Amino acid sequence: PGSAQPLMQVAKALVPLFEAGRSIDAAALRTAMEQAFGASDTSGSWIWKDAYEAAEVAQILMLSRYGALMQRQVSAPRAFLTMIERLAGLAPSHTRRSEDSVRLQQFSTPLPLAAIVAQAAGFRDDDLVLEPSAGTGLLAIFAKIAGARLALNELAETRRALLGHLFPGAVVSDHDAASIDD
């Protein structure tokens, strides 16, 4: 389960819901996944972990499109964080975990926390940002908005392929982040 192309299709289908300020509930997510995969989760064509990742990708697409504008429209980082919290509040929560996600320790950074980390890091356009366990790119998107160059690492094949779609100018590698200093 979980090839990148249908997950990108799902993410693109979810973006208009985010743009309209609508919550992505399980029914909307299931419908988008069934349309992209041509089957339900009960068929084994996709799993809920994939659906949650597609919703994360939709948030990243939103920030790719509107993140820099959102930052310019606010006078303080707290106001930007409030906007990020609103966006994250529209996304579904990860209520189901796959055995692979537990085994690979795939626990996504919540979008508001990623925004706080990015603010603390103070990404600039002359930075090269290494994300050793990039996941779907929830932290990397903030570095991209700042204009930084990206070196993204992700062990999971589907997530790595998603990163390639989302951050075409980034170097994407597949090292085991537990031994990335070797």
Sequence positions of predicted segments:
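Class I S-adenosyl-L-methionine-dependent methyltransferase catalytic core
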Residues: 1-182
